[in-house]
């Protein structure tokens, strides 16, 4: 398959892009050791990643990411005060609390390599992992988990939820972060199996 022939060039390009992103501070710090371990493997390279996050987002309509604004974004557990501070910035459109699990896009040299990575991800709890794409240029495996939360908090400047409800949402969001960070650690510890 042609992606196997193009692997070295695709890996070189991806590593250059990663180095630029690292210098700019655009890579989630807690995932950098895992990215380095994957990229040290001769048959793999990372193309994009997120270590998972809790965010407060204001958007005209749900799903309108183009016109959305981050009012708060954290790749770690958060305090109720941090979330309330972000919520107070809400002025227009819909206000959402969002939790997103980690996501890694990894190029693999061969289909067999891709399947090995996919199986490792699933065995570490990343149940939504899949082969994202196969083209002449590259084969991409997506490592993704199940944790997700979407909660409408306000609309057009009005907060629709109580502080007690917010407290509960923050507890749930932090529990999800703890869960997916454990999965990431397990995946990092087992990456040597590839």
Curated annotation (Swiss-Prot):
Sample GO molecular function, one term: tRNA methyltransferase activity
GO terms, biological process: tRNA methylation; wybutosine biosynthetic process
SUPFAM superfamilies: SSo0622-like
Top EC class, one word: transferase
EC number(s) per entry: 2.1.1.282
Record keywords: Methyltransferase, S-adenosyl-L-methionine, Transferase, tRNA processing
Lineage: superkingdom: Archaea
Recorded catalytic activity of this chain's protein: 4-demethyl-7-[(3S)-3-amino-3-carboxypropyl]wyosine(37) in tRNA(Phe) + S-adenosyl-L-methionine = 7-[(3S)-3-amino-3-carboxypropyl]wyosine(37) in tRNA(Phe) + S-adenosyl-L-homocysteine + H(+)
Family: Belongs to the TYW3 family.
Protein purpose: S-adenosyl-L-methionine-dependent methyltransferase that acts as a component of the wyosine derivatives biosynthesis pathway.
Matches recorded under PANTHER family: TRNA WYBUTOSINE-SYNTHESIZING PROTEIN 3
Record-given protein name: tRNA(Phe) 7-((3-amino-3-carboxypropyl)-4-demethylwyosine(37)-N(4))-methyltransferase 1
Source organism: Pyrococcus abyssi (strain GE5 / Orsay)
Designated gene of the protein: taw3-1
């Amino acid at each position: 398959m042609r992606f196997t022939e193009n692997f070295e060039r695709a890996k070189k390009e991806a590593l250059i892009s990663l180095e630029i992103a690292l210098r700019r501070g655009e890579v989630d710090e807690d995932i950098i050791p895992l990215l380095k371990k994957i990229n040290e493997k001769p048959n793999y390279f990372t193309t994009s990643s997120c270590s998972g996050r809790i965010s407060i987002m204001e958007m005209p309509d749900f799903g309108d990411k183009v016109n959305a604004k981050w009012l708060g974004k954290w790749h770690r557990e958060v305090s109720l005060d941090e979330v309330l501070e972000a919520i107070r910035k809400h002025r227009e459109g819909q206000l959402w609390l969002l939790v997103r699990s980690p996501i890694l896009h990894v190029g693999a040299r061969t289909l067999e390599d891709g399947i090995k990575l996919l199986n490792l991800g699933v065995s570490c709890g990343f149940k939504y992992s899949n082969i994202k794409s196969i083209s002449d240029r590259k084969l991409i495996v997506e490592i993704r988990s199940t944790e997700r939360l979407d909660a409408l908090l306000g609309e057009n400047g009005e907060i629709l939820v109580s502080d007690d409800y917010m407290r509960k949402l923050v507890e749930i969001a932090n529990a999800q972060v703890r869960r997916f960070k454990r999965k990431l650690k397990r995946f990092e510890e087992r990456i040597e199996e590839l």
